[in-house]
UniProtKB/Swiss-Prot annotation:
Family recorded in the similarity comment: Belongs to the bacterial ribosomal protein bL28 family.
Lineage: Bacteria, Pseudomonadati, Pseudomonadota, Alphaproteobacteria, Hyphomicrobiales
The protein's name: Large ribosomal subunit protein bL28
GO cellular component: a single term: cytosolic large ribosomal subunit
Keyword field: Ribonucleoprotein, Ribosomal protein
GO function terms (MF aspect): structural constituent of ribosome
Highest taxon, organism lineage: Bacteria
GO biological process per UniProt: translation
Disulfide bond entries: none
Spans through the membrane: none
Length: 96
């Protein structure tokens, strides 16, 4: 399982830990990922994702999973999130 957010694409970054004596040690900065179950209002079901906490806050800010996925760029979404986005858009198009 990759250390990548399903919704925003946030992934592991690398860099240096720099001491007071300017000694550099390579390190990995991991995203704060958590497994969450989000509810889609359009699909009327629960969807499980592995997302960064910052992405979870963004989902709430935009008004829920459906609004977040509608506005999100496909390039940064995981394959599962893209499939859910297509389902949501298809169901919204059929409803209108």
């Amino acid at each position: 399982m990759s250390r990548r957010c399903d919704l925003t694409g946030k992934a592991v970054q690398t860099g240096n830990l720099v001491s007071h004596s300017n000694h550099k040690t390579r390190t990995r900065f991991l995203p704060n990922l958590c497994n969450v179950t989000l509810i889609s209002d359009v699909l009327q079901r629960k969807v499980r994702f592995r997302v960064a906490v910052a992405a979870l806050r963004s989902v709430e800010h935009r008004g829920g999973l459906d609004a977040f996925l509608a506005k999100a760029d496909d390039a940064e979404l995981s394959l599962g999130a893209r499939a859910i986005k297509r389902e949501i858009l298809k169901k919204q198009a059929a409803a209108s």
